[in-house]
């Protein structure tokens, strides 16, 4: 079983360097183009199910990638980390260590995001008819999911670009995910 966990395309808040987790902003023209380019990655992959975060930036990305030809489900479990009262503020306010910082401001900890993502992706892949699944999520959520299975530093060092795809193999017996590749599409 294979899970393709993908980050959404570039958004207005990405360009403006605004913190966005629970809040949302639209895809930019470049973000729309990125999703179109990323769709080619899936040309020879027979996806059987698709999911996205409830954020519009993620569902819009998924619709572009699948040419609006595939039904999908929006899941709260795939949402980005909640940054509390820092939502919509400048990224310059981000602390060096984000692991628990936002909890005191009504947000989530990194461990909470990791547990939510692991639970959600495991529930998705445990379904019998789910062999090749696309799930569109967010940079922070993708990093915290990866952190459950390996040290993410090497992957993060090379960037979590918009529309990058994390290809995971799901082991049904062990209920674990193994990262096979990260496709950044040259972005």
Where are the predicted features?
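Short beta-strand scaffold positions
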Residues: 52-53, 115, 136-137
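Acidic, low-complexity terminal tails and accessory targeting/binding regions
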Residues: 1, 41, 75, 80-92, ...
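Phosphate-handling substructures
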Residues: 65-119
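GST superfamily/GST-like fold recognition
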Residues: 139-143, 171
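Active-site-proximal alpha-helix that buttresses catalytic centers in soluble enzyme cores
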Residues: 1-68, 108-111
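Generic beta-sheet signal
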Residues: 3, 131-139
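Active-site signature of alpha/beta-hydrolase-fold catalytic machinery across serine-
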Residues: 64, 144-148
């Amino acid at each position: 079983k294979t899970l393709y966990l993908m980050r959404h395309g570039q958004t207005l808040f990405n360009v403006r360097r605004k913190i966005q987790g629970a809040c949302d902003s639209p895809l930019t023209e470049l973000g729309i183009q990125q999703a179109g380019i990323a769709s080619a990655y899936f040309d020879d992959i027979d996806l059987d199910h698709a999911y996205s975060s409830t954020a519009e930036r993620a569902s819009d990305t998924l619709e572009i990638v699948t040419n609006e030809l595939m039904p999908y489900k929006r899941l709260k479990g795939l949402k980005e980390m909640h940054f509390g009262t820092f939502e919509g503020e400048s990224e310059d306010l981000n602390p060096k260590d984000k692991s628990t910082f936002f909890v005191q401001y009504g947000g989530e900890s990194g461990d909470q995001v990791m547990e939510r993502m692991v639970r959600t992706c495991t529930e998705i892949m445990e379904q019998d008819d789910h062999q090749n699944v696309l799930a569109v999520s967010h940079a922070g959520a993708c990093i915290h999911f990866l952190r459950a299975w390996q040290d993410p530093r090497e992957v993060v060092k090379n960037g979590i670009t918009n529309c990058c795809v994390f290809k995971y193999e799901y082991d049904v017996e062990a209920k674990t995910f193994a990262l096979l590749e990260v496709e950044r599409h040259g972005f």
